[in-house]
From Swiss-Prot:
HAMAP family recorded: HSV_SCP_betahv (MF_04021)
Gene this chain is encoded by: SCP
Species name: Human cytomegalovirus (strain Merlin) (HHV-5)
Subcellular location: Virion; Host nucleus
Protein name, per record: Small capsomere-interacting protein
Sequence similarity: Belongs to the herpesviridae small capsomere-interacting protein family.
């Protein structure tokens, strides 16, 4: 048997960061994080990678709103 203790996988860490961005940084309901809107999926992925820059939560909220607005006006 192996002596290594099972640790969190990369996918679990990524999911944990994703939930942190949705719930703490953007203050969105959990249901929204499961949405399949392409802009939301793209921006959440971007924000998850930028986890060290969460000093100004309002900037992330405004950026997300701006990106959603831009995506709707281009149609």
């Amino acid at each position: 048997m192996s002596n290594t203790a099972p640790g969190p996988t990369v996918a679990n860490k990524r999911d944990e960061k994703h939930r942190h961005v949705v719930n703490v940084v953007l203050e969105l309901p959990t249901e929204i994080s499961e949405a399949t809107h392409p802009v939301l999926a793209t921006m959440l992925s971007k924000y998850t990678r930028m986890s060290s820059l969460f000093n100004d939560k309002c900037a992330f909220k405004l950026d997300l709103l701006r990106m959603i607005a831009v995506s709707r006006t281009r149609r």
